[in-house]
Amino acid sequence: MFRGYRKAFVFLTLVATLTGLGCKGASPEIAAATKQKSLQIWGIFDDQDAYASIITDYRLAHPYVNVTFRKFRPEEYEKELVNALAEDRGPDIFMMHNTWVGGYTNKISPLPPVVNLAELVISGTIKKEQAYELHAKNTVSVRQLQSAFPDQVVRDAVVTSRTQDGKTAQQIVGIPLSIDTLALYWNRDLLNAAGISEPPATWGDFQKDVIKLTKTDAQMYIVQSGAGLGSEKNVPRATDILSLLMMQNGTVMTDDNGNPTFEQMPPGSGDRAMVPGAQATVFYTDFANPNKEVYTWNDKQPNALDAFVTGKTAMFLGYQYQLPIIQARAPKLKFGIASAPQAGGPEKNFANYWLYTVSKKSKSQDVAWDFVQFMTSDKEAVKYLEATKKPTALRSLIQDQAEDLDLGVFANQILTAESWYRGADVAAAEQAMNDLIDDVLAGDKPQDAVNTASQRVAQTILPKSNQ
């Protein structure tokens, strides 16, 4: 992150010459600072190998720090994490989804202005000498975070809190390595057969292509689907797709304090028969409405990802993390990846990512935050990204991935990717959005359905200014 990160050190004068990597003859301060420390990172998706190069680099200057990564299955991770933190057996550093911030602020030690720790320094030209120096290092500021990362990271990772003297302060509670975005996977053979030369760039073209690509039998059962969307039970991340449509349609998802506003008519939206959030919901559910020309999907279809993998649906809105799943399950499938369709206004995409944060109960908070900053610097982050084949979160690395066949589409979307605050109970908020889809499909008035969903989401909200 931060190319100038190491230039921000404020060096103290406590230096001890070492024998090898030991601390013989060191001052009490050096001896205490270089006592062996173990940092444990908890997360999902990655193995220890993904961080191996970064850990090796960090230990060159901090040989007294051992770093290990523990991988969990996605379905078990949050429960294990919450229980471990409550029982004081949790990790020093853990991965936190960008939508979890509201529910985790009381479990996090925010990034302090300065971290204090010892670093091994090698000096001399002919006779090399090793010495530990105690450093008081300035940490990343909100301005530096804003400069290095997309705007959505600042909205998610910076929390306004009250200090003991009653003033407000902005604090960083996490830093990402990668940002994923929704994109359009498309089956080349099926689009070719339908005479469609390129994937749709707008939702209007998407509708037209869906009509061309959908095939039914004599009993009107769907034999080939144009796209796997319209419902929620068998569409992975249906609430993200709906949120993307809402935001592209001009919906303001929340106010400045995080309270839901997607049921409202935004200022300056002109004469509309329906609020944009309700319009977007109708647009989405039309694909699963048998009375509509764009009908292409229903709850009897398989999971949308499975349908795409088996060639039964032509288009699938998904994330980069699903790419290796598709490649592994269907190595002969001819498919492409295109940017998410747009609604005609300013480009907007949907962000889905994880932040690395430090537990309030860690006994090595300064070292833990120093490692998080080191890991998310552009020099080190690129090693993780190359090992995992994930899209970057850093502005400085976007161009490096822009022409990559697998990552280019996703990397090019991160600067326009947005998300929205879902309070302290993300599961409850997402269930409210899923039920919104079901209610409209069941025939409820769209405005009534979005009103109900907004009221339910509001019950999960902790005001951002008081977290």
Question: What does each model-identified segment do?
Answer:
Residues 209-215, 247, 251-297:
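Glycine-centered hinge/linker elements that transmit conformational signals in sensory
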Residues 71-80, 203-208, 295-309:
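Short helix-initiation/N-cap motifs at beta->coil->alpha
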